[in-house]
Amino acid sequence: MAAFAVEPQGPALGSEPMMLGSPTSPKPGVNAQFLPGFLMGDLPAPVTPQPRSISGPSVGVMEMRSPLLAGGSPPQPVVPAHKDKSGAPPVRSIYDDISSPGLGSTPLTSRRQPNISVMQSPLVGVTSTPGTGQSMFSPASIGQPRKTTLSPAQLDPFYTQGDSLTSEDHLDDSWVTVFGFPQASASYILLQFAQYGNILKHVMSNTGNWMHIRYQSKLQARKALSKDGRIFGESIMIGVKPCIDKSVMESSDRCALSSPSLAFTPPIKTLGTPTQPGSTPRISTMRPLATAYKASTSDYQVISDRQTPKKDESLVSKAMEYMFGW
């Protein structure tokens, strides 16, 4: 009897590993249900589960989720409204929840309102201040103070010649003042500044180290002004500033009104070549470039005085050439 009772326990113990390793176990099917719903292609809130996935543990999971969705959510939930777009980026700003009429007052919205008011209050205070907000953020207001052009005397207080100038005075921009050279090098400096434009007039100081130069155009005067601080002759540093001496400008204007024909004659020409009156045409020794074209299209034909010798083509000349080899 004891041996008969022990025999059936052997196969019972041996059958346990076969039951644990059986491929027909429903556990892999239960584990498959724990994957996220968006990976399985299921809807966010399915009404009825699929027939093949119904089992005991899966029903328990659904029963555990249902109380959370039913009882734990507020009457107008905010999060489930965007449940269908959980994988997409946000489509509204964080400030839209405050002004949207469909959403109720939540602790999140009540917590955001004082923060936004604090953030906006400094900006409102800055913009409400008269003059400060516009001058900081308006490009047009930045250039408004610069519309009033200051005279050179106001820009540089060390100018003593500009004491008689007022803000209504209009100075000629074609005049420049060159200074910083010795008296012996005045002609050399004048010759150097003649390379930057046509000098109409120059007024040199008898005792000082400056001279006033008037150019033909304002562009030439600006080119001369760009040479401020340049060293000439490796020992002379020259300064160039806009001329503010009204007496020099007025005297040149009076001379131009009295003799208009001489106003356009550059005085710099008197250094090398003599000046000619404006009515007399200038005679140039250079050969015109159109001379060769005019010669080719001339109506006249050149005829030589004597006849050019030609070869005799007669029969006698051919016979003599054949016989004697001429």
From Swiss-Prot:
CDD domains: RRM_Nup53 (cd12722). Belongs to the Nup35 family. The modification Phosphothreonine is found at residues 106, 129, 265, 273, 275, 280, 308. Its main location: nucleus. Functions as a component of the nuclear pore complex (NPC). NPC components, collectively referred to as nucleoporins (NUPs), can play the role of both NPC structural components and of docking or interaction partners for transiently associated nuclear transport factors. May play a role in the association of MAD1 with the NPC. The modification Phosphoserine is found at residues 53, 55, 66, 73, 99-100, 121, 138, 252, 259, 279, 284. The keyword Transport applies. This is Nucleoporin NUP35. One of its GO terms (biological process) is nuclear pore organization. Keywords: Membrane, mRNA transport, Nuclear pore complex, Nucleus, Phosphoprotein, Protein transport, Translocation, Transport. The gene is NUP35. It comes from the Eukaryota. It is a peripheral membrane protein. Interacts with TMEM48/NDC1. Forms a complex with NUP93, NUP155, NUP205 and lamin B; the interaction with NUP93 is direct. Residues 1-33, 71-92 are annotated as: Disordered. InterPro entries: Nucleoporin_NUP53 (IPR017389), Nucleotide-bd_a/b_plait_sf (IPR012677), RBD_domain_sf (IPR035979), RRM_NUP35_dom (IPR007846). Residues 170-250 form the RRM Nup35-type domain. GO terms for cellular component: cytosol; intracellular membrane-bounded organelle; nuclear envelope; nuclear membrane; nuclear pore; nuclear pore central transport channel; nuclear pore nuclear basket; nucleoplasm. One of its GO terms (molecular function) is identical protein binding. It comes from Homo sapiens (Human). Pfam families: RRM_Nup35. Signal peptide: none annotated. PROSITE patterns: RRM_NUP35. It is found in: Nucleus, Nuclear pore complex; Nucleus membrane.
